[in-house]
């Protein structure tokens, strides 16, 4: 069968690479893909943008694509799933209505409140003055979020009132995030440890994926501004069996049932960003209506199940007949980024030292890369590669991932040196 993966990041390289391992599959197309997917023998890039839904549909129909897997949020919010389904094509992802769980922070917070799903206390604002009054009433630390899609960067954790007020003015009056910031959510600062809890949903049944933990801040020891994610590992030891059960009972099931009850039946990957307190009680920080990036990369490296088989079962409402199998080992991925990210960065730098053949128990996933006219791999984004490895412990996986990137370099590249530090501290204690 033929599979189409929509997207061009590290997440899509990992999903397409995994899909191509299925015995059911003869070809995996990636639209538009990157240099990594271009160089994979089993994958084929297609020059169509992720939100060009008419062109994606034409391609899928002409090529007789049997299954489409959507990577990023933008096409989901624009209704790619609705369009493909209306044309009778199999596609795994939520409808535009269901994708509001990520497309609007205010929609999500109101939904959580309606269904008594644990989350931070909050209020929505469109005007500067009432927002500032609320800030002064609540004090700092406090969290300010742009309502719409801001590529994972529309969240400010303000440690002082001055910082909070500046963020509100930037978003509501200064247009810092364009349309995404025309409405903001202000919410209480939650203390605890974060985890990424990702599941597959078929509208009614849920199949949990392996747990993971992302590293959002750009600098070591979680300093500096938020990014799309600088590295991740799986599994996340903070998600004990008990926390896993609580998350399913208090968050995932009520969300799936609540969405269905409100007429937005959810199918696709559902990613709950959790904050877990000292007592092991999870609260929802955010929902994403897709797999996380960079979490996908270490999770796919551990996945033993057939991803395509699971997606097909989900499209048919038969996820309850499936289980997922994982490598017992831990995996860890480190993002190599362009100097200046998450601010302004340069593109077009040649990347040297990429491994020429497959690596045992490791993989270099490409994100912001493209093939230049002379077939050299050059940078084309802020997050450029995710260097990922397996190990019997998180510490071993970390050591292998950093060893794998020793020879890889380009002008002004950087990475965090401490990915996995929380899990490693746990292992050492």
From Swiss-Prot:
A family per Pfam: GARS_C
Highest taxon, organism lineage: Bacteria
Binding positions for Mg(2+) per the UniProt entry: 286, 288
Catalytic reaction(s) noted: 5-phospho-beta-D-ribosylamine + glycine + ATP = N(1)-(5-phospho-beta-D-ribosyl)glycinamide + ADP + phosphate + H(+)
PROSITE patterns: ATP_GRASP, GARS
E.C. number: 6.3.4.13
Ranges that cross the membrane: none
Enzyme type, top EC level: ligase
GO molecular function list: ATP binding; metal ion binding; phosphoribosylamine-glycine ligase activity
Protein name: Phosphoribosylamine--glycine ligase
Organism of derivation: Escherichia coli O6:H1 (strain CFT073 / ATCC 700928 / UPEC)
